[in-house]
Amino acid sequence: MIVCCGEALIDMLPRQSQAGETAFAPYAGGAIFNTAIALGRLGIPTGFFTGLSDDMFGDILRETLKSSNVDFAPSATLSLHTTLAFVKLVNGSATYAFFDENTAGRMITTEHLPALGDFCEALHFGAISLIPEPCGSTYEAL
């Protein structure tokens, strides 16, 4: 099994409401999350480790992982918010506003590290989750 380790977040993509107002729709995302989803959909045994929130956005992330055949049992569930990334599109180019302070993904610590047995053949890390603390040190310890 390949265990992907890193951020899972909700991309809030711009839409237009029925009244013509600007609105946002939630979509599961994150660089490493998307890698895990792709591997799972290709039928490659895949696990995912991060901090997942027990909020409604965490439910979206877990359902997306489950429906893509990704084992999220290695992930920790925390009673903190999910990271949100609001997206602004201008001429096809995206800019982001991230809301990540004290979120489930960012606040995982070495106490949340999973026991990876012989089933784990490879770990895949990457993206922004390797930088902030305490999650950066947690991934390094894994």
What are these regions (language model features)?
Residues M1-V70:
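Glycine-rich phosphate/adenosyl-contacting loop at the front of the ribokinase-like
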Residues P45-I128, P132:
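Conserved N-terminal subdomain of the carbohydrate kinase-like
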Residues M12, P132-E133:
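Glycine/Thr-rich phosphate-binding loops of Rossmann-like dinucleotide-binding domains
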Residues A28-G29, R106, C135-G136:
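A conditional alpha-helix N-cap/helix-loop micro-motif detector
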Residues C4-C5, C120, C135:
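Generic recognition of cysteine residues
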Residues G136-L142:
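Charged helix-capping and loop-helix junction motifs
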